[in-house]
A protein has these predicted regions:
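Short, contiguous alpha-helical
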Residues: 2, 14-29, 33-76, 113-157
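Basic/polar N-terminal segments that are highly enriched at the extreme N-terminus
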Residues: 1-11
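Acidic catalytic patch
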Residues: 100-115
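Soluble or luminal CAZymes and related metallo-dependent hydrolases
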Residues: 9, 16-20, 87-90
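Helix-adjacent hinge/juxtasegments
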Residues: 63-102
């Protein structure tokens, strides 16, 4: 590999992210319906609220990268688990549809997301992925506290 050869392609980054999203979906699905938006520990947010935050970041961020229109997803209303999973699946399809529209040079450009977060595009995307991983970890703790074995973290298929 030469110094000018990227170690990861945009497609590889998308597949990495989608692997995390598949795992997070399994964590959402592991929650009992009545605990998704009610169970928390130590005053922290419920996993349902965290999942809605992940949804609010994922597609709006990528859509903003593509179009430079930064429209936040503001609906944080509690919903039944089956509706949350349907929204998750729709956002996965949106991500797959939008991602190829990002020109390769765009990843190195500096943008201001949502009128307040100025950073390089690949760092904004990395933050969205990191935020999902962080919140999923909280979901793992909640599931264990509920006596439920969470999905194996290393299986992302």
């Amino acid at each position: 590999m030469s110094a000018n050869t990227p170690f990861m392609t945009a497609e590889a980054l998308l597949q990495h992210w989608q692997g995390h999203r598949r795992l997070t979906r399994r964590v959402i699905d592991a929650f009992p319906d009545d605990q998704l938006f009610s169970f928390s520990i130590g005053g922290m947010r419920t996993f349902g609220a965290l999942a809605l935050e992940i949804l609010a970041m994922t597609v709006p961020t990528v859509r903003g990268v593509v179009s430079d229109e930064w429209i936040p997803l503001l609906d944080h209303t509690q919903r039944p688990k089956h509706e949350l999973l349907a929204q998750w699946d729709a956002s996965t399809a949106d991500l797959d549809r939008l991602w190829p529209q990002i020109p390769s040079q765009r990843f190195a450009e500096t943008v201001t997301a949502f009128g307040q977060y100025t950073n390089v595009v690949y760092k904004l995307i990395a933050y969205a992925i990191d935020n999902e991983i962080h919140h999923r970890g909280q979901g793992y703790v909640y599931l264990r506290a509920l006596g439920i074995e969470p999905p194996p973290f290393h299986i992302r298929a």
